[in-house]
Amino acid sequence: YDVAGHKEAAKRGLPKLRDSVSAFPVMTDKKNVDVFKKFKVLSKTEVASREHIFVEKYIKQVTIEAETAALMARTLILPAAIRQQTELSEAVAATEAADVSTSTIRTQLEQHVELVNKFNEAIEALEAAGEAHHEDVHKHAKHIRDHVLPAMNELRDLADALEARISADLWPLPSYREM
């Protein structure tokens, strides 16, 4: 929503819930449970059960997305980035052998290597964030929101940067241009 929408919500006394993890517990607020009970829609236990199911579904869905992102990054994008790095390295060597200045291509190689290293670190960070588990589903959901989602976003940003640098013939996925 735009700023006007947030202002209108505040004016009406509506809660400012930025994400699902913040919204889930509101389901079981007494005033909400009372409305469900009053109109015989759901009992307190049923509301709590539904809220628990929503939290578990969120955890499962984001976990699958994170595992898929890490797998694609490690098995598709990283190998393509390494092949691009190899091609750049060979170009530097061939240019040096021809006794021609390599400053431009060497800079490209150095920037690419730095990006590949950051990308690999981001894969490891996402995998590490995904390994943490909490018995309490609400704590686990908060961990996912606060650690796994930011790690996925960082990995995505780096993958986008690599896509812009890697030759189209090496890139293993449909590009934005192709979609």
Short names for language-model regions:
Residues 1-179:
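C-terminal amphipathic alpha-helical interaction region
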